[in-house]
Structures are given as structure tokens and as C-alpha cells.
Amino acid sequence: MTPVVIFTYIPAFASDSNENVNIYNFLLQMAVWQAASGKVYLPPSTPVARVQSTDEYVQRTNIYYHAYSDRLLTVGHPYFNVYNVAGSKLEIPKVSGNQHRVFRLKLPDPNRFALADMSVYNPDKERLVWGCRGIEIGRGQPLGVGSVGHPLFNKVGDTENPNSYKGTSTDDRQNVSFDPKQLQMFIIGCAPCIGEHWDKALPCAEQDIPQGSCPPIELINSVIEDGDMADIGYGNLNFKALQQNRSDVSLDIVNETCKYPDFLKMQNDVYGDSCFFYARREQCYARHFFVRGGKTGDDIPAGQIDEGSMKNTYYIPPNNSQQQYTNLGNAMYFPTVSGSLVSSDAQLFNRPFWLQRAQGHNNGICWFNQLFVTVVDNTRNTNFSISVNSDGTDVAKIADYNSANFKEYLRHVEEYEISLILQLCKIPLKAEVLAQINAMNSNILEEWQLGFVPAPDNPIQDTYRYIDSLATRCPDKNPPKEKVDPYKNLHFWNVDLSERLSLDLDQYALGRKFLFQAGLQQATVNGTKTISSRVSSRGTKRKRKN
């Protein structure tokens, strides 16, 4: 409420016996309260919880480890899974350069390390965690451009430079191939990468959608798993549900869902576990311009609007003697993209990346001793063509070539190697720190086994030998629950690095790069190798006396 002052002007008339009229002016002032027209923003009644950065409660040590994987190889068909004749057994998996490779790196528990110098931390008051400081994703195989396509691709003709008008027919599909959009990307985090795609949505209950109408679509967030297809130029869409003609895209995605990382969601995550940092490089251009075949679902606005009251303002109808009058083409235009030049000058892989400050509150701390590395790289997208003589005769004795006697096979290979620089960090077991971690994920405290363990009432327990026999009592109906993996229903490329850690950083390529890049030197203190700043041995330069 705001006060409002109102002034009232009242004229008064008075006369005497001599009929002289006097005019008196009265000005009255009064104040009233009126509702405020603007909005008033009040502070919240309770304080808002503040999420702390890991740098505020994680203490970093000067102990670094180098972790590395084996050479990771995979071989398969670039377009689809190959099953046996009965279709009951998968014989050859789908391995494409346009797939996401999601590595789940398992790290050892640092709290179970037998450290030579036990003064590094106090197990009664602290817990150890890993901090990621550097990573290098190695890629083998030469650079190459792969092609995708469909033997029955839905295209009527070229719409960029047509030489004759071509309408639609019953079946206009052609055998078309093209190279996909060029994509290099990797995302590092201690939780799986969050992806997004467009999918078929449920219509409202009161809506009566006729058969053949376009369904509503919605944006879906889901975890990017190993083997999920990336965007190759046709968008992040559930093609299996939204393209029922099975001919609008290439074979490798016609029955798949293409996902794209939801960078907006991960950047605004309050904890930032899904993405510490990422690197991305995409490029494409439109190479060919085609038009779809089939009946157009959304006609060009013309006389069908308002019972013919609206004129056609998009084109002038052709003459009835022209082909365009009886067989008008549709307006479903689309391009086929191309990734263009593949060069070693623009490679994100086979080079180190150092993490100084993450984009979120988690500055590289690997909760649950694991790290997720999501990779896409189709710059090494060569597909091998393997031909086999089917009749078994000696190839040197074949006189006339007959293509029916040779079977052609396609194979694609992937080669990876991952190296890490891990920093040993410690977290004090203080009340405010534990409250912060418990609000973030209470399973972390269970992993640290911080619960109170009461003393046993009776040190002697009964143990039956044949507990499942009919002669003994029934076993316990409520056995102790095993630890449940939150990602057990998701598919990742699991890489165990529990026994692949080393303190000898100077013995590995990434370790030497880290020492030289940071200007550090390695020393051994009480049997534990530590890292310290490099001190220059050069003396002070003296001025020359005149």
C-alpha cells in the first residue's frame, strides 16, 4: 500500500444585506491508502542452501599417480548387428565410427592403499579420494572417410539443378550413399553423460487425432550409453518411432535413436558430476539437395483454408495441360550433409588435456572411484571391404570373373588407449563437510563405511554346514543385501584400472608431459614419491662493472 494525497477545491458563496457577494475558496487535503501497482519481492523466509565447490573442502596432496589402459580394440559391422539364420544369436555386433564410445574407468580405492608414508592422512579423521588432473585419449588407425547409405533411400530427384519436372510415383526410392557429418568430441565426468533426443509424445486425452496425422514430439533426456548413435546430419531423433517408412535416413540409424549431449543441462547441474570439461569439433556442409517422395502431410496453404475463402498466395496454379497440374511435386526438401576434409591438423585426440578448473562445482573429484569418458570420433571411419571366393576354387585358376562367386563383407575397427594423471586428495570428516556430501549423495558416506558398528553381543555364532538340507533349519529369509550398482541396467565399456597405477610418472609419456608442463620435479620422501616445484639452479646474474 502506498499513501496518496488528494486535494479538494470547494468554492463557497456568501452575501450581506447590501447584496454584496463574497466568494471564499477552501482547499481541503486528505490522505488515503492505495494498493501498489508494482511488484514487491521479499527475501525468502529461510536461507537457501548453498552448494559448495569441492575446492572448499577437498585438500589436495602432492602425490600423483599415472593410470593407463590396455590397447582397447573392437571389430564389427558398420551398419547393423548380424544374427544367425534363426535370429536367436548375435554373431557380429554393430561397430560404427558414428557411435558413442562410453568408457567406465574403475579406479582402486585409495583408502585401502598401503602407503609407505602413513603421515599423508589420518584414517580416523580423513578419507582419500582421487582427483583427475590430466587425460589423454589415444586413437589408433589412419584417418579416413566412411560412407553410409540406404539401398532404398526416399528421394525423388535432385532439386538443386533439375533439368525436367519430376512428380511423385508409387515408389521413388533410390540407392544412395553419402558421408556423414564430421564429429570429434569427448566428455569427462564421474557420472554418465546426459544426452537429449526428440521422441514421440502422448497426445492429450481430449484430443481426437485422426489416423495418419503427425504425432506430437517431446524432448527426452537419457543417459548416453556405449553404442548409441551420434548425430550424423539428420538430427537427434528417434528414427525407429518417427520414420515408419524405413527409408528417410541411412541404414545405420534407420532403426536407432541418435543422441546429442545435453550441454545446457550438464552445465547448469548444481554438482557438475556428469561433465568436468569437454572438447568438441563439428563441421558439415550441404552437398546434395533432394526432395522426399510420398504424400505430403502438410499441404501448402491454399483453398482448403476457411472453406476456400483464402487465396493461394504461395504459387500460381499451372495450366491443366502441364504435367505439374496432374502430378504436383511436394515441398519436403532436405540436404545430404558431408563432413568434408579430414585432416590431422584439427585432431582432438592423441594430445593431453589438463584440468585446472572444472565448469561445475566438482573440480575433477572421482566419486565412487570411477570416471566416465564419452567419446565420438568419425575421422577414422574407414570401412574394410573383404571379399571371399564362395565356391572354394583357387583364385589363380579362375579364368572368367563372375561376381556371383564372390561374397562381399564389411567390417569396421576401433582402437583406443586412455591415460590419466590422478592426484591423491583427502577430505576431512567434519560435520559440515559430511552434511554437504550427504546432501549430494548419501551413498558416498556408505562407501566410506562411516556408520557406527556396535560391539558384538556374543562372539560365538552358529554356523551350519548343510544349511540347505532337510535335516537342518531353514536359512535366513532376509540375507544381507549386496551393493547395488546404480548403472547395472546401462551398457558401458568397462575398463578396470585397479592394478594399472604407478607413481613413476617419468616412466610414461603422459607423466613426463605433466612434469614438464607444470614445471615440476619428482622426489621420494619416506618411500612415497611426491611432486614439488622445480627450483632453478642458475645463479644471480651480476652486472658488469665499468
Swiss-Prot record:
Q: Which HAMAP family match?
A: PPV_L1 (MF_04002)
Name the family: Belongs to the papillomaviridae L1 protein family.
What gene, per UniProt, encodes this protein?
L1
Q: What is this protein's function per UniProt?
A: Forms an icosahedral capsid with a T=7 symmetry and a 50 nm diameter. The capsid is composed of 72 pentamers linked to each other by disulfide bonds and associated with L2 proteins. Binds to heparan sulfate proteoglycans on cell surface of basal layer keratinocytes to provide initial virion attachment. This binding mediates a conformational change in the virus capsid that facilitates efficient infection. The virion enters the host cell via endocytosis. During virus trafficking, L1 protein dissociates from the viral DNA and the genomic DNA is released to the host nucleus.
Q: Where is the protein found, in the record's own terms?
A: Virion; Host nucleus
Q: Which UniProt keywords apply?
A: Capsid protein, Disulfide bond, Host nucleus, Host-virus interaction, Late protein, T=7 icosahedral capsid protein, Viral attachment to host cell, Viral penetration into host cytoplasm, Virion, Virus endocytosis by host, Virus entry into host cell
An example of a GO molecular function for this protein is: structural molecule activity
What GO terms in the biological process aspect are recorded for it? Answer: endocytosis involved in viral entry into host cell; virion attachment to host cell
The source's superkingdom equals Viruses
Location, primary (coarse class): virion
The uppermost taxa in this organism's lineage are: Viruses, Monodnaviria, Shotokuvirae, Cossaviricota, Papovaviricetes
One Gene Ontology term, aspect cellular component: T=7 icosahedral viral capsid
* Quaternary assembly: Self-assembles into homopentamers. The capsid has an icosahedral symmetry and consists of 72 capsomers, with each capsomer being a pentamer of L1. Interacts with the minor capsid protein L2; this interaction is necessary for viral genome encapsidation. Interacts with protein E2; this interaction enhances E2-dependent replication and transcription activation.
**Protein name per UniProt:** Major capsid protein L1
Which InterPro entries did the record assign? Answer: Capsid_L1_Papillomavir (IPR002210), Capsid_L1_sf_Papillomavir (IPR036973), dsDNA_vir_gr_I_capsid (IPR011222)
